[in-house]
Structure formats: C-alpha cells, structure tokens
Amino acid sequence: NGEIYNYQELRKELIEAGHVFVSNTDSETLIHGYEQWGEKLVDRLRGMYAFVIWDTKKKRLFGARDIFGIKPFYYAQMNQTFLFASEIKAFMEHPKFDKIFNEDALGNYLSFQFVPTNETFFKGVFCLQPGHYFIYEDGKMEISRYFEPNFTGKYEKTFDEAAAEVEKVMKESVEKHKISDVEVASYLSSGVDSSYLTYLGQVDHTFTVGFDEGEYSEIQDAKDFAESIHMKNDAKVITPDEYWDSLSDIQYYMDEPVADPAAVALYFLSKEAAKKVKVVLSGEGSDELFGGYNIYCEPLEHTAFNKIPMPI
C-alpha cells in the first residue's frame, strides 16, 4: 500500500546491477530491491508505504512501514496464526481472530487523547511503528527500527536562512508528491499550511468544506485564495444533521476511537474530492512539525512543578 517516490532512480540502479524488470511499477522495484539489498532496502526508500515480501528462499516474511507512519500496518499473533492488514476490521473476517477489548489502550486514550504505544483497542492487535521493519520466521517476529530523526540541538542559521531552507525542501517534496498518472488536486482551508501547499503544488482543482455556521466556516476565505491564484474551488457546507449522521460511518472507517473532531470535516472533504480525483495534497502534519497546537506548550508550562520541594 502506498507510493515509492524515488522508485525510478532505484530501478535504474538495479537495472545497472543486472536486474531484469517486466513492468514499470514501484511494487516490482521493491522486490528487486529486496533481492539486491535485503533489509537495507528500507534505507533507500522515499515515500509513503506499508508492504510485505515473502522470501521463498529463506522462508520468512519481511515487512516495513514508512518513516512518518502515513500508511497503516496492523498485525496480530493468535491461535498459531500470524495476521497482518492495513485495517483492523480486516481481521474480523478471519476465523482465528479473537475480538477482545483492550482496557490498557483505553487508559492511555483518556489520558493523552490517543494511544502513544503500539497497542490498539483490540487485545493482541498491534501497529507496526513508523520507521520500523520486521522479519517473521519460524513463528517468531523480530522488529527493528531503521529510522530515527537526529536533532543536534545546535542551529546557528538566521530566521531568513531557515525560512529559505524550509521553502526549498517544501518545493522539492511537493514536486515528488505530484508524480502521478492521474490529476493531483489539493485540500484547501483558510490556514497557512494548506494554502501554502496548494500554491506550491500549482494544482488545477481545490476542495473545501465548512459548517452551517458563519464563524466556523472557512469556505469564503478559501474561495478567495483559490481565485487569487487562478484555481478552481469546490466547496461543501456540512449541515448539523449531516454531521451527526456521519459519525457511525466515520467510526467504522477509523477502526478505533479518534479524539479529533476535525476527522468529520476531513471525512466529508475526502468524500467530495473522491467524486472527481484520486490524489490530493493535504496540509496534515504541519502543526505537528512546527508546534501549532497549544498542547505542545504544556511541558514548558509545567516546568515550575519541577521545583516543588520534596516531602520530608
């Protein structure tokens, strides 16, 4: 599941090494890459992916997930059976799967509004963490981390230099993400993140949703921005009835509880976009990278408690 954005470069390197391809797909590139480099293949990949390869020679299963965890990967070992899927609901169809509620995940969810470990709300079902790969052999699963961000803590560039570097990286990344056989569109709100990506992407089509309350709708701002850069904008207003009626469907698709009310808007946004396109750019992730939420300030606010005297 996913897309390998640098597969053409890898394919060229593998052909030079003697590999013979029968297609021009990133999936086949993964197979030849594993044959050439083994587990080290993941160090060369750029993209969003979750995949497995059955090694017929070594009789083992190799699988990996991208460094940001964009593509999901779930697994379970129960009743002498190893299960894996992109969605937890897929396990429900298997006769060896035991559907048992995981109370430990509930405690984490109520404390942090998400589950910070690899556990899920189903006992025995785990998610492969971002930037990890696994080898399943002789009934045993060994998981390894292949990517870890490196923050030195030293940064001596000026604000303007940093901004220029971010822009350079963003432009290059968006260009990679636009490699597609079909039209690429963009989600658009009035926020800086989606507006910036939309501008960089130079797409023809944008999609926006808003609520049936003026103060909670960004439709007009999004339309004005799209018009200013000569892009088409499709907008949908979500009514209160549509909001409440959609919750059961959203929960079904999410598999687990999600403490983000924006999931409703994203559901309708995706539903509208899917009527016309298959690929969209999204501003998801910018707040996490640049500390855009108040919750990221909480550790600093609580530092004063470190100085409270210990009891005698």
PLM features: residue spans?
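Active-site adenylate/phosphate-handling loop in enzymes that bind or generate adenylated species
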Residues: 67, 268-312
